[in-house]
Amino acid sequence: MHFKLIIAFVEDRSTDAVMQAAREAGATGCTVINNARGEGIEENKTFFGLTLSSQRDVVLLLVEEHLSRHILEHIGEVGEFDAKPGTGIAIMIDVEDAVGIVHQAQELEEILEENL
């Protein structure tokens, strides 16, 4: 079984919706890292000219490769990543190997058999 890691940088108010969307699309769980900060091309400024950095959450999803594209696209739609600037981004990278997921592998095999 091969895995991908989806890393989503999400506005903190959208984290729960993105997590639910990932589960609906086939993810079996996730890890959330709270209070990340970042900015895009343009800095967010307040009316006093100060820089305003919005809080983000980092959502990590270790998913089976055959489900990965669908999960990535679904969280992008729900999070409105392409529709509104600054709402978030998600990337997907290959995972060479993983340990500690034997209990999820059996469940994933059943999900894959149903969906493929």
What is each of the regions a protein language model found here?
Residues 1-116:
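Positively charged, small/polar-rich N-terminal and surface patches that mediate targeting and assembly
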